[in-house]
């Protein structure tokens, strides 16, 4: 496996490439252009310039997270073909720049949601949290404010400002879209892009819904093992894969994350893994935690063991970290706790690997 670290370019991150380079075991970054709106082509020269910057820092740039899918594609509107064509052009440009993996989201309207971006933990650190009753009682205006007020004036992934004006209208639109219709629109997209994913040697890893249950009346795509099987069955290309996000899937107490890792890695359909832990407060309330198994409710050792034993050879990254040591950063994406998480994951991987000698 290759360990990567999520990073935003163009001054939109408090973490520097030179700092990432000093984290043991990290070989590269997972990055994106948050300033290019969904549906527009990513220029090849822009991609190459960023890759050059990353390479000069001694790191690789082989993972993109994310190339956002335009909402018209998800809605199945007549304009979708133009946006799909642009997406395919971006894929070609990424391939020619040496990109190997694209992580992307198919949740409608928003990629993820937390009711609190700074939830105080008993050790004095802060983590993101989800409280279902609070979330369900929020207006659209308060939904946006709850996410933006604690963003430290940085772009939150999946909450790019361009989305805000249409959010209320989009949520209303999806009230009349069944899960079956939504999956039909997704299949149309997959059938269009997967032949090019194979031609361009690009692995696609769809990110699970976060949280993995119905939210604001929106259709759900991936929240449990059955929906993952359904999604992968929409297009049987080996490039049509899953980003196994342990924290997203693990928020549902009924999900057996090690079993998921075993099943879908054995199929060769997991090109990318996000490893993080969560602590369940109730069946639908949770907060994020430090990566260690003892700090949350997921057995990180068993997850890593399942990955290793079932042939995982893709990319992995420490996911959301707590805010510790008075760091000022994008919520969930500071340097310190994610660096600790990276070292912990590397240690687990080494222990599992050596136990199989």
Where in the sequence are the language-model features?
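A short glycine/small-residue-enriched secondary-structure motif
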Residues: 22, 59-74
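Conserved beta-strand edge residues that scaffold enzyme active sites
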Residues: 34-35, 68, 108-109, 211, ...
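Histidine-acidic metal/acid-base catalytic patches
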Residues: 1-4, 9-11, 52-55, 72-76, ...
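Active-site-proximal, glycine-rich beta->alpha crossover segments in alpha/beta enzymes
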Residues: 93-97, 101-186
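An N-terminal, globular interaction/scaffold subdomain
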Residues: 43-59, 64-66, 83
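Catalytic domains of carbohydrate-active enzymes, especially glycoside hydrolases
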Residues: 9-34, 53-57, 96-102
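Glycine-rich, proline-tolerant flexible connector loops at the mouths of alpha/beta enzymes
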Residues: 32-48, 216
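Glycine-rich, histidine-containing beta strand-loop boundary motifs that form or position
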Residues: 63-65, 103-107, 208
